[in-house]
Amino acid sequence: MDYCAYCEDIFVLGDVHADFRSLANLINRKHPRIVLQCGDFGYWPGFKVKNRRGVLKDSRPRIGETKLYWCEGNHEDYSCFRAHETSEVFPNVFHMGRGSTLALPDGRTVLFMGGALSVDKAWRTPGYDWFPEESITTGDLDRLPDVHVDIVISHTCPAEFEIMDEDVLARDSCQQALSHVLAKYHPSLWYFGHFHRFKKGCTMGCRWTALTMAGCSNWWEHLAAK
């Protein structure tokens, strides 16, 4: 199998924040077979969401035959799904529960581990636009499968990844939980969003990539080959 050609068919995306127009434009231009998305997808099915210019966003992602798999971030409507369960929330759009896995056609296994703490919690209303379920729990860690994992898709990142220096976003309990994931699986690749900045590194043999958000540069890239 030509792994380089195959990976051209799989995209990894940073935060979407319900900007489904940018998502559809990208997919219609590039026609990926599979999309892996790193949380803050913008799953607010009961909300009418506006973009930064005050224009009403598309309420449903329209992605044709592409299959999209996303983990939850800290900005989703947790009243409309369970963080540890996998479900098809729109046609060809799958929420991947914490600890769920996806087998790629090249034989690699992807683990999804969403969740992160909201630094804007003080400006949000519990049960309306903020939910305590955003945090990764010990129960989530207990449910992790005993399988080989090649790639992790998460929203935030393990504490070991040097993504930001002395910033309020750079440390939360979810990062400590993801450190457990890193130690348990020793994946070769890890992708995440949350910080709205682009950065790459390698820690404990794991090549990691932080992606930005829809509408910005470096908000997506092709999945790295083996």
Roles of regions detected by a PLM:
Residues H17-A24, G42-F47, C71-R82, L102-A103, ...:
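Active-site environment of divalent metal-dependent phosphoester hydrolases
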Residues R108-V168:
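Active-site-proximal loop/helix segment associated with metal-binding centers of metalloenzymes
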Residues D9-I10, I34, R108-T109, D150-I151, ...:
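Structural motif
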Residues C4-Y6, T101-D106, H180-K184, H196-K226:
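Binuclear metal-dependent phosphoesterase catalytic core
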Residues L13-V16, P126-I136, F161, E166, ...:
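Catalytic cores of nucleotide-sugar-dependent glycosyltransferases that transfer UDP/GDP/TDP-activated
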Residues L13, A18-P105, L211:
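Core catalytic region of metal-dependent phosphoesterases/phosphodiesterases
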Residues G42-K57, H148-Y185:
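Active-site-proximal segments of metal-dependent phosphoesterases and phosphodiesterases across multiple
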Residues G64-L68, Y185-S188, C206:
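A short helix->loop->beta-strand "cap" motif at the edges of active sites that frequently abuts
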